[in-house]
Amino acid sequence: MRTGIGIDTHRFADGRPLILGGVEIPGERGLAGHSDADVLTHAIVDALLGAAGLGDIGQHFPDTDEQWRDADSLALLRAVLERVTAEGWAVDHVDATVVLERPKLAPHRNAIRDSLAAALGSVNVKFTTGEKMGFVGREEGAAALAVATLEPIGP
């Protein structure tokens, strides 16, 4: 069994949708990024890559490569799951937290969890605020953290 941790942050940007776990969240602004800026899925991708010993998201999907511009992060997640599986690992569980002042995410919990569970299987998502401290508390951006546990495939 192996465990990996992932973290990601993105600034807010006007004129972009807020995508978390592949779900568009209604609100005034989204997150800036080369891809769809899904901070939650990016943290999960990094946790999976770390657990499998496969580096990090920037090595696999560099923001200097135009092919990843506006990429659907769930597609990146599925690609990483294929690589993890090819290395002989299966997802046991993923636990993730989004840190964001607003909008409030609790009403979207089931949709986000269901979206991620379709790819991952066992997943838990949590939400918290920055308690008005730091870049999250000043509503400059959002952060996400994830822990992934992998188990070997087969005997």
Regions found by a protein language model. Give the residues of each.
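Short amphipathic
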Residues: R2-D8
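Polyampholytic, low-complexity intrinsically disordered segments
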Residues: A13, P17-P26
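A short glycine/serine-rich beta->alpha loop
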Residues: I25-S35, D63-W68, K132-V136
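Short alpha-helix carrying the canonical HExxH Zn2+-binding catalytic motif
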Residues: A37-V45
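Glycine- and Gly-Pro-enriched alpha-helical subdomains that act as flexible
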Residues: A47-A90, E101
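Short, conserved loop-to-beta-strand elements that form functional interface hotspots
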Residues: H93-K104, H108-R138
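C-terminal edge-of-domain segments
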Residues: V136-P155
